[in-house]
Amino acid sequence: AWCVGCKACKRECPQAVDLAALAVEARARRWQARGGAPLAVRLLASAPRLVRRLGVLARLREALPGGRRLAQRVFGLDARRTVPRAARHPFFARQPAEIGAAGGREVVLLVDDHTDLFEPDVARAALAVLVAAGCRVHLPRPSDGPGGYPTGKPALSAGLVVQARREAAALVAALAPHVAAGRPVIGLEPSFHLMLRDDLQMLGLGDAAASLSRQAILLEELLAAEAAAGRLALPLGPVPWQRALVHGHCHQKAFGLMPAMQATLGLIPGLAVETIDAGCCGMAGAFGLQADNYPVSMAMAEDALLPAVRQADAATCIVANGMSCRQQIHHGSGREGMHVALLLQAALTSRRST
């Protein structure tokens, strides 16, 4: 019941047993036996689509007296949590299909539906960094509606395997021309993007998914690899902070990607980088939003993450690439975490102003 899908078991078990995958199967069987998943589970698995259509409900939850308590009774959302709000200007509201130098290295920036709607500034920062690095950036989006592509990860985590397979299959098909052209597919949200390297195989999506898995890469991985090869020309200046305190997303750690995160942050002049020795933040997507899970969620965060964040001074920025990690950090400490793309964008702006 308390599996948060961190995949630490797969990393640490000598036989690489993936308990997160077993938990997905158990949830799927449970919903099948019940005749379907509860409404709250289905809504949380499609949050961006729900917010676009019924965003007024989220606003009423905050505005009406007792709105949070009512939402807890009806949807299971803990009244102590603040749910993500839709941005006034989503990323795809004003972006062309491709941007950057015509002769630059061609890459794909996959802006998922959550990043597009809830944190478009992260996508804009990543785009600015890639363009500054000389890339020609392709920005795929669905042709049949607003926003970015759903990856299927929230649905899969909830045990809604049919929905997850449908969403993932559409994404694989949309990216197939880019994969065939040899373009790296760059992602921003670790759990969503690393699904392309792992969980797609579980959904049985064939050779196209296998090919995509080999070209899916996180932003910090690409930048670290290019820098190590001597090919990265990114004009970075100092940032307003002296130290970056980094919380690694569970899936970054499970896939051994924290060295890439540290190497990318190390490109910023004068910035000391320190990683918090902590496990899961406890939010884990929709897990920490649910009232039944709130005590466990906060206990996980209080084990190491939140005490370290509270001790950080004003000269320290908190870096966390996971969207739900940043939500938990803010909820438990009042501090704002930032995606590495935003910190790199600040370093670009600093260099241009000097």
Task: List each model region and its residues.
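Iron-sulfur cluster-binding electron-transfer modules in prokaryotic oxidoreductases
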Residues: 19-354
